[in-house]
């Protein structure tokens, strides 16, 4: 083979080897502003970084509408979202599929892929559904174990004030759905609207009786509820969809880093309700940094060094 041809061929091979490295774009990792958002966002961030993926940290970017807008506009590349929010995103709250873990996942996966080129990866088995938690002393004194009991208590004129995010108060599939199903209506004087969506803040407000609050917006995987003396109320009518957390990534980014799906699959598969409650409690009750809690969990499980 002529030397010139050999030299040219070597350059082509070198370029082919070097191209992925040159083309590798930093992955913008985001999450919601609450405790679990910080935990899951840091888990995704650290898993990607452990495999040498360059990242931009946008963890705890904002509320659901903010983060959703960011990924659909390309400002974010990946973030953890909840399957049940598909009902809200696609204005499809009446479909019973959202109340079935597998059907809800398959539906939002299909819709987001078709409409937004967003890919839903393996979800966690946990259900982080919205709920209402009341102070233990109030629950015991008034025999409150379910939202039906709460409705009866309110109709009897019971004292009640709920700390919640504006999103929970306003979204049709959140507090208004509970009110409609159980036949009660909270007045403005019975609501304390708090910035952001961090249930650690709403639960703390109820525990400390801030501004007369004795109940809080909470999630099914919240760690601080029992630790701070509150009790979640069951939802016997099954008003809420299943909210299983899963990484959502832009299709173009997944094409660039196809191994991302297999890296994150076992991690999210390990996050059952008990595990998430414990990890969330480490942050919200013990005051540990979400970054450290995520790092310790990943190391303990052998997914990072």
UniProtKB/Swiss-Prot annotation:
Induction (record text): Expression is sigma S-dependent. Induced by both osmotic shock and entry into stationary phase.
Gene Ontology BP terms: amino acid transport; amino-acid betaine transport; cellular hyperosmotic response; glycine betaine transport
Entry-linked Pfam families: OpuAC
Broad class of the protein's primary localization: periplasm
InterPro entries reported for this sequence: ABC_Gly_betaine_transp_sub-bd (IPR007210)
Residues making up the signal peptide according to the UniProt record: 1-23
GO cellular component, one term: ATP-binding cassette (ABC) transporter complex, substrate-binding subunit-containing
GO MF term list: transmembrane transporter activity
Localisation: Periplasm
Keyword terms: Amino-acid transport, Periplasm, Signal, Transport
SUPFAM superfamilies: Periplasmic binding protein-like II
Role this protein plays: Part of an ABC transporter complex involved in low-affinity glycine betaine uptake. Binds glycine betaine with low affinity.
Assembly: The complex is composed of two ATP-binding proteins (YehX), two transmembrane proteins (YehW and YehY) and a solute-binding protein (YehZ).
Family that this chain belongs to: Belongs to the OsmX family.
Protein's name in the database: Glycine betaine-binding protein YehZ
Lineage per the UniProt record: Bacteria, Pseudomonadati, Pseudomonadota, Gammaproteobacteria, Enterobacterales
